[in-house]
């Protein structure tokens, strides 16, 4: 809201309020300097350059410009900028690899084994890198987030109506390698495994769904996808032990 007010004043769509402009400028400058003091020099410099554009014609911007120049001339800024460029290149390679490997899953009548795709997608390496501090860790986490949303939601959304259950099962299995705490994904995996006749695996997936808090009693009792499991003792035990 404050930014919109400044832009409106800058464009002449609102009467200028010198007191408000001074207060907002001082607050934004203090925020940027605090970020720099905490070591976030890339973000601080970007905020200061944005201040130059936002306050141009409204306020003397020399303090913001000088602070940005000072930060950008420092070794820490150059180091972080180099790290950011490396991380962006890493992320681009990662997303390109994901697109290539997932295209194989989408186009195949018989999907590759889950463990094979997990290896070529480098899920283990991405998970390890996502735990690192700094830009590399953030880039790896973004790659994992993109991969997870594709596997857990978008691919099944397209493939389930086409009854491509084998492909959907692989999608959910890979999604659970990225993040294994979503009860709905485990439940959906149990359903497609049951539809594929993989009953033992289906019960195991259902157990994980319940373990992570799946509690839709009506769906568990009526979902036709699970009908092939209902006479099994291990299924009955799961239902009996459910909270």
What are these model-derived regions, one by one?
Residues 51, 174-175, 208-209:
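Canonical positions in the second alpha-helix
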Residues 159, 171, 186-193, 205:
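TPR/Sel1-like alpha-solenoid repeat signature
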Residues 2-170:
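Alpha/beta-hydrolase-fold serine-hydrolase catalytic core, especially in secreted/extracellular enzymes
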Residues 26, 150, 184, 218-219:
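Start-of-helix register in tetratricopeptide repeats
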Residues 60-64, 185, 219:
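TPR alpha-solenoid repeat register
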């Amino acid at each position: 809201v404050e930014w919109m007010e400044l832009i409106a004043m800058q464009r002449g769509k609102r009467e200028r309020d010198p007191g408000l402009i001074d207060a907002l400028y001082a607050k934004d400058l203090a925020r940027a300097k605090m970020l720099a003091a905490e070591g976030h020099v890339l973000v601080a410099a970007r905020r200061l350059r944005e201040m130059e554009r936002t306050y141009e014609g409204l306020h003397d911007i020399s303090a913001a410009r000088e602070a940005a120049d000072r930060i950008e001339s420092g070794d820490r800024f150059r180091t972080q900028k180099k790290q950011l460029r490396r991380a962006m290149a890493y992320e681009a390679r990662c997303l390109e690899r994901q697109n290539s490997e997932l295209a194989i899953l989408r186009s195949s009548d018989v999907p590759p084994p889950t463990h094979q795709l997990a290896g070529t997608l480098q899920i283990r390496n991405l998970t390890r890198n996502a735990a690192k501090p700094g830009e590399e860790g953030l880039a790896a986490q973004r790659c994992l987030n993109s991969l997870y949303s594709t596997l857990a939601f978008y691919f099944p959304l397209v493939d389930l109506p086409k009854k491509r259950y084998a492909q959907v099962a692989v999608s959910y299995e890979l999604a659970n390698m990225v993040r294994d705490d979503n009860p709905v994904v485990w439940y959906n995996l149990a359903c497609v495994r049951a539809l594929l006749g993989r009953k033992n695996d289906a019960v195991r997936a259902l157990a994980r769904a319940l373990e992570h808090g799946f509690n839709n009693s009506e769906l568990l009792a009526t979902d036709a996808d699970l009908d092939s499991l209902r006479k099994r003792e291990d299924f009955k035990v799961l239902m009996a032990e459910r909270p």
